[in-house]
């Protein structure tokens, strides 16, 4: 099973003939602004504050959450003004490190991160309207095996569409739809 923060790689696996079943979207990620600074309320307006010198986001060329962050800033005409403050992580994990270590005063990340058991309740975060960015499709594909079929992998692939999985995903800040 290959699980991805977008559909690009699951689709590439299918196009390469390596998928046992078609890739599918199992949830949609949500974008938030997050800060570990005491007394700082993350908001798009507050990104312009002179006390904010670094804004973390994942590299928009390769990371879906970085692409979404860039879209939000473009829709609010903030990108030119904030360009000098932007600090790019090569992944959402590195971006989160910039935020949690306060190397960046604020950053764009996944809601699932701020709701995770190890980080829940740390810092302040603000959800950003999903209307401001292209939906962040979370994808999964079942990969072919040369040997016998892996029934555990198939069960997990199917589980991601179950009501139990959807409830778990919602608890961790993902959006799920009935048709998924």
Predicted ranges, named:
Residues 1:
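Internal catalytic or translocation cores that form aromatic/hydrophobic pockets or channels
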Residues 4-17, 22-180:
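Exported/periplasmic ABC-transporter solute-binding proteins
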